[in-house]
């Protein structure tokens, strides 16, 4: 047996962005790997045939993070290309190119390209797509300009490239950087003509999007200067070319929107009792207003802290009129189902970290999950035992001695139970003294669990006791436990 090494994390691989084909035969997902020589990461799409259980890589461009199913056998994936004419003049403007891939044969071709940085795309119906893309209030899109207008804007950018004028709050975001005057804008694209057009006003920053044939539900923050914590809920109808406001933008922060028959479902944070990190209330919404179905006292996302996962996730899926979602409960994650008549019912889970999931029928579920002290893999669950479908990290920890976290729950001074964990040093000898490290998670609204955590395992392998807990302010025990308002 051997000890965990610092650089072992360079071997870890992370599956995410799970998307089932419409017929449920195939699962497409992204796999992230470390590129040590390039000082970065590689992302490629993989396909799991759920009949044979075999998985194979289907892209090799090292920058493909999401598959969009067009039908049972074809996916779209995006690549980005810098405009060569502008690059030679010292400016970087990005085209988004979508390629169409037959997952059976591997045959692929360019489907279409868009002159902007696309952040998400959804197939509405044959030949029509809804997409979101970055737009800017303080400058036009160079790729849409020509002639004197284009030359004038190029000159202005070259003249002012040494500084930024910041006029909005917040100024920046973790993992994004400065995004002053930037908006996420909703568009319609018509493949037959190559035309696209904006569906939201200039100052709308679009958040959640849910698409069905001929209609789009979305939420957005309309703002200038200071971004609010509340957002509006809207429905755009293709036949009428009309946008209806379902919830005004000054009422709720919103965790999810989806279709519920002819109405809509909204998970809104009222923020009356516990502020901006309050757990959501279920609302059924139509143009007449909202029906309050009660607050759910857990987070409707999986918020387990780990340093061994990266990628996009989907925490909610609607099948018919049942909403399936991942929550954070205790020190782990649960798959839950919500129906209007019965409310929330837990289906599967416990102390493991359920990261991402998809389902087409509400009977078979595909997960990216970290089970026990394993690294993330893809699993299938149909009501019985969890079935592991991939072994991307099977050899990485083979022969490595790990420290199993021991759960210790104690009661604090005002009678509230606090969940904690202790990891003994690898090779621990009773009676011998060891140094210790107390690890405190950030947040707010996060939670430590008993799963694999590279940094803490490395400390244990280096001869330290490691102890950590989920104090007040953590997720998994309801609003009152998580409340940090002074």
Q: What feature does the model see in each segment?
A:
Residues 30-51:
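Beta-propeller domains
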Residues 356-363, 368-486:
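Serine-hydrolase catalytic core recognition
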Residues 37-43, 84-95, 140, 177-183, ...:
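Short, solvent-exposed loop/turn segments at conserved positions within beta-propeller repeat blades
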Residues 12-27, 61-78, 84, 115-135, ...:
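Conserved beta-propeller blade repeats
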Residues 44-50, 97-104, 185-190, 231-239, ...:
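Beta-propeller blade signature
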Residues 4-10, 54-58, 107-112, 195-200, ...:
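A short beta-strand motif characteristic of beta-propeller blades
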Residues 43, 85-95, 135-187, 279-282, ...:
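Predominantly five- to eight-bladed beta-propeller fold
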Residues 32, 134, 439-443:
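Glycine-rich His-Gly loop
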């Amino acid at each position: 047996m051997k000890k965990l090494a610092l650089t072992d994390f360079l071997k870890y691989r992370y599956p995410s962005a799970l998307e089932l084909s419409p017929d449920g035969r195939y699962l497409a997902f992204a796999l992230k790997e470390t590129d040590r020589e390039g000082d970065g990461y590689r992302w490629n799409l993989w396909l799991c045939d759920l009949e044979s259980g075999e998985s194979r890589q289907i892209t090799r461009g090292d920058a493909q993070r999401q598959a969009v199913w067009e039908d049972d056998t074809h996916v779209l994936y995006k690549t980005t290309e810098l405009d060569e004419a502008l690059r030679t003049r010292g400016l970087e403007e990005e085209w988004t190119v979508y390629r169409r891939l037959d997952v059976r044969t591997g045959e692929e071709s360019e489907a279409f390209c868009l002159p902007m940085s696309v952040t998400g795309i959804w197939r509405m119906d044959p030949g029509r797509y809804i997409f979101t893309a970055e737009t800017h209030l303080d400058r036009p899109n160079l790729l849409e300009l020509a002639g004197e207008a284009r030359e004038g804007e190029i000159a202005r950018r070259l003249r002012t490239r040494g500084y930024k004028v910041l006029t909005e709050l917040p100024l920046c975001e973790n993992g994004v950087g400065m995004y002053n005057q930037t908006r996420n804008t909703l568009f319609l694209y018509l493949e037959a003509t190559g035309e696209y057009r904006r569906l939201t006003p200039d100052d709308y920053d679009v958040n959640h999007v849910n698409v069905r044939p001929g209609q789009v539900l979305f939420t957005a923050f309309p703002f200038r200067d200071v971004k609010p914590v509340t957002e509006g809920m809207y429905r755009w109808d293709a036949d009428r070319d009309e946008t209806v406001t379902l919830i005004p933008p000054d009422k709720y922060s919103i965790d999810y929107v989806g279709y519920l028959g002819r109405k809509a479902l909204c998970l809104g944070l009222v923020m009356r009792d516990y502020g901006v990190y309050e757990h959501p209330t279920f609302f059924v919404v139509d143009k007449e207003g909202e029906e309050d179905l009660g607050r759910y006292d857990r987070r409707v996302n999986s918020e387990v802290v780990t340093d061994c996962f990266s990628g996009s996730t989907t925490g909610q899926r609607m099948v018919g009129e049942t909403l399936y979602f991942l929550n954070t409960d205790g020190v782990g994650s649960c798959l839950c189902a919500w129906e209007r008549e019965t409310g929330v019912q837990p289906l599967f889970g416990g102390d493991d970290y359920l990261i991402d999931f998809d389902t087409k029928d509400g009977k078979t579920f595909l997960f990216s999950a970290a089970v026990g002290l394993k690294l993330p893999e893809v699993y299938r669950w149909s009501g019985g035992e969890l079935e592991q479908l991939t072994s991307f990290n099977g050899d990485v920890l083979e022969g490595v001695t790990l420290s199993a976290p021991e759960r210790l729950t104690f009661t604090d001074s005002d009678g509230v139970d606090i969940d904690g964990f202790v990891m003994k040093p690898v090779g621990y000898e009773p009676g011998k003294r060891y140094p210790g490290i107390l690890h405190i998670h950030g947040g707010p609204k996060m939670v430590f669990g008993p799963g694999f955590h590279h940094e803490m395992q490395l400390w244990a392998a280096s001869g330290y006791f490691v102890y950590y807990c989920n104090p007040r302010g953590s997720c998994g025990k309801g609003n009152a436990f998580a409340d940090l308002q002074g």
